[in-house]
Amino acid sequence: MSTTSGTGGVSYRNGTQRSSLRTQSSASTSSGGQKASVKSKSVLRKSSPAALGGGSSKSGGGGDAGVPGRVRVAVRLRPRNGEELIADADFADCVELQPELKRLKLRKNNWDTDTFEFDEVLTEYASQKRVYEVVAKPVVEGVLDGYNGTIMAYGQTGTGKTYTLGQLGEEDVADRGIMVRAMEDILAEVSLETDSISVSYLQLYMETVQDLLDPSNDNIAIVEDPKNGDVSLPGATLVEIRDQQSFLELLQLGEAHRFAANTKLNTESSRSHAILMVNVRRSMKTRDGLSSESNGNSHMTKSLKPPVVRKGKLVVVDLAGSERINKSGSEGHTLEEAKSINLSLSALGKCINALAENSSHVPFRDSKLTRLLRDSFGGTARTSLVITIGPSPRHRGETTSTIMFGQRAMKVENMVKIKEEFDYKSLSRRLEVQLDNLIEENERQQKAFVDEIERITVEAHNQISEAEKRYANALEDEKLRYQNDYMESIKKLEENWSKNQKKLAAERLALGEKNGLDITSNGNRSIAPALEEVSELKKLLQKEAQSKMAAEEEVNRLKHQLNEFKKVEASGNSEIMRLHKMLENETQQKEKLEGEIATLHSQLLQLSLTADETRRNLEQHGSEKTSGARDSLMSQLRLPQIQDPGNAEKPPVARLFEQVGLQKILSLLEAEDADVRIHAVKVVANLAAEEANQQQIVEAGGLTSLLMLLKNTEDETIHRVAAGAIANLAMNETNQELIMDQGGIGLLSSTAANAEDPQTLRMVAGAIANLCGNDKLQTKLRSEGGIAALLGMVRCGHPDVLAQVARGIANFAKCESRASTQGTKRGKSLLIEDGALSWIVQNAKTETAAIRRHIELALCHLAQHEGNAKEMVKEGAMWELVRISRDCSREDIRSLAHRTLTSSPTFLTELRRLRVDIR
C-alpha cells in the first residue's frame, strides 16, 4: 500500500505484512543513575495473581453451573522505533518494567512514579511465542474443552495490537501472531472426522458490522437471544476450516478488505475493529451407545443415550487504536472514523467501569462493540486482554489511560460455563439408519423364509409323486409276474395229470384181457409209480400255493409302503401348514416391531422436548434439584458449599462425608442406576485415599461392598474405580489381611484376567502390589493366583501397568529376602518358580525409569538368597546385576548390587570363571 500524505484518506489493506515490532537498531538508555538518586513515591495497584487466561478449574457438571473467572490482563511494551530513538534521546523512559515481579512503573515526573501490577508483564524483547503461551493458550485450551473464550488487544494506535494478534509470519515464522498460532493448536487437537471448525471474520466500521470475507455484505444485524442473552450474527459468512493453509488464505483475504489509513502516529492505522470468531464443535467419546439387535427391544430402549457435543467459541478482537485528534492529524473522513473509534472505545470503558464497580446497570447497548463483547466482560467466557503501550514520554497520557483501562478490566468477574449438549440429531440419524437396516434385514429374512418354504414344498411334492409312480409300476410288474408263473404252473400240472390218467387207463385196458389174478397183481405193480408221481405233483402244488402266498404278502408289503408314503405326504402337508403359520406369526411380529419402533420415535421426540425444556429451566433458574439418586448425590455435593461458607477450605469429598454420612454413600453402591454406582464408588475411592477415613470405611462394610462390586458387576468403569479404592485400603496392614480373608486376591485376579483397559489393569496391579508387601501373606498370595495375575497383566504393555507389576514383584522379593535373612525361608523364590525371572531380565534395561528402578530392586533382593543364585546365573540375571553395580543412577541400588555380588559364593565363582572384575 502506498500513501501520499500523513493524513491520507481511507484505503484497503492488500494483504502485505505489517511493520514488525522489532526495530532495526536498539539504543541502550541507562537511567540507573537517575533512579538511584531520586526517591520515588510509588502507588501499587494489586490484583490476585493467577495464571493468565485461565480462571478457575473446568466445570464438570455439564455446563449448568458457572465457575468464577476473572478477566486476565497482560501488558506488552513496544520497542522504540527510529523516530523515537532520535526524538526522545534526551528524555528518560516513562515506563519501567519489572517482569519478574509482574509490575510496571509509570514515571509521572522526576520524583513520583505509579506502580501497577498485572497478570503478566511482557518486555519489548518478548517473543510472539511467549506472548501466545501466556495470553492466549489457556483460553484456546478452554475453547477445546467447550468454554467460550475471548482474546482482545487494546492500546494506543501504533503500539502493536495487530502485530500481536494478526501477524501471518509469511517472511519469518517466529513472527506469527495469536490468530495463526491458536488455529494451529486447535487443528492439532481436533479430529476432522468427528469434529468441525468454522470461522467468521468481521470488522466493526463506523458502527456497522461488515463481513471481511464478503465485502458486499456490509451491514450485518446483531441478534440477541431473549432467553439467555447470547449474541449471534446470522448474516455473517461461515467458512469451515480443514487445514492451516486455508485459514491463512482466509486471514489474507480479510486483511485485504479491512479499512486502514495513514496517520501521523501510524502509516497503516486500523480504522475498524476486527473480530475473528472461531466455532469449535467436538463430539465427546462415551461408552454408551445403541445396543445390538440380539439384546432385545426392552434393553435397546433403556440404553438410548444421545452422544454429547461440546461447542466452544473463540473470539479474537483486534481493537482499533485510541488516538487524540491533535496528535494523529486526522481530518475529513479520517476524522469521522477517529470519532467513531473513540466513541466505541469510550462505551467499552464505561461498561468495564460499571462491571468493576458492580453497578446494577451496565450500558452494553450504547455501542455495537459492547453488544458484541457482552459475553466477554461479565458473561460466561474466559477472557484475556493484552494492552499494548509505547515507550515514548510524549504519549504519557495515552499510556496512562491504557494502563488504567487494563487495571479496571482486571476487576471484572466472569462466570465461566461449559457449553455441552446432547446431540439428539445425531442419535435420530443413527436410529433411522438402524431402523432402515432392520427393515431391510427383516425383508431379506422374510423373502428367504418364503423361498425356502416353497422349495421344500415343491421338493416334497416331487418326491411323493415319484415314489408313488415307482411303487405303482413295481407293484403292477410283480403282480403280473406272479400271475403268469401261477398260470404256467397250473397248466403244467393239468397237462401232467391228464397224461398220467390216459396212461393209467391204457394200462388198465391192456391188463383187462388177461385173467383176473394176473390183472390184479400187474395192476398193483403199475399203480405204485403213478401214486409216487401224484405225490410229487401234490408237493409241487403246495410249493405253488406257498409262492402265491409269498406274492400276496409282497403285494401287502408294497401296499403298506404306499400307505407309509401317503402318511409322509400328510406329515409334509402338516409341516407346510406349520411353516405357513410361522410365517404369519413372523409377519405379526414384524408389525409389532414396527409399532414399537414408532413408539421409540415418539419417545425420542418426547426426550428431545423434555431435554429442551429442562435446559431452558436450568438456564432460567440455575442448577435445581432433580429426582433420582445421582442428582441427589450431586446436589449434596454442592449443598455444603452453599450452606456453609466456612467449609471452603475443606475438600469437596470431606464436606460430602460430613454432610451426607458414610452409610448413605455406601448404600448408593447398590443402586440400580449404573451412573449412580459409578459416582458413589468414586466418592468412596477419594475417601479411602485419606488414611483417617480407612478404618471407618472398613468398619461400615465398605471393603465388602467394593469386593461385591468386583464380583457382581461387569462395568469396567466400576471395576477400575473399585480396584483403585481397594488399592488405597490395601496400604494398611490390617486391611490387607481382611482383603485376603474375604477372597479379595481371587476377585482381583479375575478382574485382571477379564479387563482390557490399561487404567483398570493399573489399579488392580497397584492393589496386588500393596498386598505383596506383607510378609504374612506370601504363601497365600501365591496359592490364590496373585503372582500369576501380576505376570498376566504384562500383556497390556502400558508403562503405568508395567510399573505397578514391577513394584509388586519388588515388594514380594523384598519380603522373601527378609525371610531368608531371618532363616524362615529356604529353597528357591516363589517368583522364580512362577516364571517371573525371565520377564524381570527382559525388562531390566527398559527406558521407563519407574519400571527399571523396581526391577533393579527386585533383582538385588532375589540375589541376596543363595538358593536363587544358580537360576539367576542360568537366566542371565547375574549380568544385569553387574550392569546395575556399575551403571545404575542411584547410589543405594548400585551399592546393594555390588554388595550382593561380592557376598554370594555362586556369583563369585562364576565371575572368576569368566574373568570378570567387579571391583
From Swiss-Prot:
Instruction: Using the UniProt record, give the first listed, main subcellular location.
Output: cytoplasm
**Keyword ATP-binding found:** yes
Query: What start-end ranges are recorded for coiled-coil regions in this protein?
Result: 428-492, 530-621
* Compositional bias ranges of the Polar residues kind: 291-301
Q: Where in or outside the cell?
A: Cytoplasm, Cytoskeleton
Q: Could you say which protein family the record assigns here?
A: Belongs to the TRAFAC class myosin-kinesin ATPase superfamily. Kinesin family. Ungrouped subfamily.
**ARM repeat ranges per the UniProt record:** 650-689, 691-731, 733-773, 775-814
Q: Where is the composition biased (Gly residues)?
A: 52-66
Motif D-BOX, per the record, lies over 382-390
| Effect of inactivating the gene | No visible phenotype.
The domain section of the record reads: D-BOX motif functions as a recognition motif for the ubiquitination machinery.
Name of the molecule in the record: Kinesin-like protein KIN-UA
Which keywords accompany this UniProt record?
ATP-binding, Coiled coil, Cytoplasm, Cytoskeleton, Microtubule, Motor protein, Nucleotide-binding, Repeat
Q: Which superkingdom does the taxonomy of this entry point to?
A: Eukaryota
Q: Which GO terms describe its biological process?
A: microtubule-based movement
Cellular-component GO terms for this entry: cytoplasm; microtubule
